[in-house]
Design a protein with these regions (language model features):
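Flavin (FAD/FMN)-binding glycine-rich loop and adjacent Rossmann-like elements that form
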Residues: 4, 55-57, 79, 83, ...
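Short, hydrophobic/aromatic-rich segments at coil-to-beta transitions
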Residues: 150-156
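Conserved N-terminal/central alpha/beta ligand/cofactor-binding core
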Residues: 9, 15-17, 41-42, 48-145, ...
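Aromatic pocket-lining residues of Rossmann-like dinucleotide-binding sites
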Residues: 36
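Beta1/beta-strand and adjacent pyrophosphate-binding region of the FAD-binding site
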Residues: 12-26
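Membrane-embedded transmembrane-helix bundle of lipid-linked glycan/lipid transferases
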Residues: 8, 21-23, 32
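N-terminal Rossmann-fold NAD(P) dinucleotide-binding loop
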Residues: 29
Length: 448
């Protein structure tokens, strides 16, 4: 029988009142906070760790995936493009020269508009970027629960070294990655157990030597991926090798399994010319819980959406299918002043997987932050935001709202689960990332 205790009521100090409050300092939260601040409202960002960037930094997924469609057409502009360049401002990179000046198009056979980046350099650059944009960032502070008045969030309770405190705001953006605010505030959500995945950086003497000789430090210190991926076959015992990132038990199981993979790999590679030099310090869940919004993105959506806040792509496909994401995928009818941003926006099936990529997370963050600022200025709810006003601001800032004729021919790739032909341990990504699938299974086409 589950036990409960009653906690005595006590007064909680209000330490901040602001216009827009963002929960989560990943790429979506950064974009949301900066976009809102650029519209002239006061913004506070609450981050549970001590670095910005989320999975891109503390999760070691330091690959800014393509923002072009693979046919030479830039799909993501605005902050999605800006943040790519912020991440490499002080870092080595492998950005193709053809894209360095931020053109809208390039030759169709050009390399993809993407780059790897150095994590510490990106962290420091993101600190500088948010400070320059006037965002008040509060580190080492964990969102606990919302303060509700009907269907309106009036504030949030935060736990930190100062104890339990309250932050009050007019508009809230949930960029937690796990829909923590929208779930605890009573909105509908969907959860998904996802595969165990583990990225880390390593030093291998031969690889390092080649990288140094070529003047390529990113190649000298490559990433490695280990994972447990279910085959999808009937009766496969690997089907239970997934974890729920919304529970304490699920998170701890994920950590146990992922570090177990790393330990097994380390035991098999104990030699003088090899060293594991960094481990992620946040669980590397792909998807956990997402908003069930007023509308959603589906994988087979290939049509014009009047309320589009920007285009998104299945980044690893070449050519990549281009989709339009609806404003209604950021909101729910059940909450009057809360937006979702990042991997937890309203998208189903493979559409949800598309929305977890860094560029898509930044896009939804920029849209949510801009919309929140509009709502503050106009004194309206999230449902009453003037979509045309939002779209004009986004478009003026470089966001591609709708597919162009050149993008319409890109067709979806058929995704399936399969056993790879290569043996476990074979490098199958590129010279910057090597992939080892301990169990010998992978998702075809999903090499990230």
């Amino acid at each position: 029988m589950e036990q409960h205790i009653r906690i005595p009521e006590k007064e909680v100090p209000v330490v901040k009142e602001t216009d827009v409050l963002v929960i989560g300092g990943g790429v979506a939260g950064i974009a949301a906070a900066v976009a809102a601040a650029r519209q002239g409202v006061k913004v506070t960002l609450i981050e549970k760790s001590i670095v910005l960037g989320g999975l891109a930094t503390s999760g070691h997924v330091c690959v800014y995936l393509p923002i072009d469609d693979g046919n030479g057409n830039k799909v993501y502009g605005g902050l999605a493009e800006d943040l790519l360049h912020v991440c490499i401002r002080y870092s080595q990179d492998n950005l193709p020269e053809v894209w360095r000046s931020k053109p809208d198009t390039a030759p169709a056979d050009s390399e993809r508009y993407m780059t790897n980046f150095n994590i510490p350099a990106a962290v420091l650059s993101l600190d500088e970027f948010t400070a320059q944009e006037g965002v008040d960032v509060v580190f080492d502070s964990v969102f606990s629960e919302p303060i509700m008045e009907g269907n309106t969030v009036k504030g949030i309770i935060v736990e930190s070294k100062s104890g339990r405190t309250a932050y009050m705001a007019k508009m809230f953006i949930d960029a937690s990655g796990d829909a923590d605010l929208v779930y605890r505030a009573g909105a509908d959500t969907e959860t998904l157990k996802t595969i165990v995945s583990h990225w880390f950086h390593e030093l291998d003497f031969d690889i390092m030597k080649r990288g140094i000789e070529e003047g390529d430090m990113l190649r000298a210190v490559p990433m490695r991926w280990l994972g447990l991926v279910p085959s999808g076959g009937a009766g496969d015992e690997k089907e239970d090798l997934t974890c729920d990132g919304t529970t304490t038990e699920g998170v701890n199981e994920y950590i146990r399994l992922s570090r177990g993979l790393a330990l097994d790999f380390l035991k098999k590679n104990r030699r003088d010319d090899f060293a594991m030099i960094s481990l992620p310090f946040t669980p590397q869940f792909r998807m956990t819980r997402r908003l069930v919004g007023t509308d959603e993105l589906k994988y087979d959506d290939e049509y014009h959406i009047d309320s589009s806040i920007g285009c998104v792509i299945s980044s690893l496909d070449k050519p990549a299918t281009v989709y339009e994401f609806p404003y209604e995928g950021l909101i729910t009818d059940k909450l009057s002043n809360v937006f979702a941003a990042g991997r937890m926006v309203s998208a189903s099936g493979r559409g949800w997987a598309i929305m977890r990529f860094i560029p898509a997370c930044v896009l939804t963050g920029e849209a949510a932050g801009t919309a929140a600022a509009i709502a503050v200025k106009d004194g309206c709810t999230v449902q009453q935001v003037d979509i045309r006003k939002l779209q004009k601001i986004l478009e003026d800032n470089g966001v591609k709202l709708h597919r162009t004729k050149a993008m319409e021919g890109n067709k979806p790739k058929i995704w399936k689960l399969e056993k790879p032909d290569a043996q476990p341990g074979a490098p199958i990504i590129n010279k910057y990332c090597v992939h080892v699938d301990t169990e010998g299974y992978r998702m075809a086409g999903d090499k990230h």
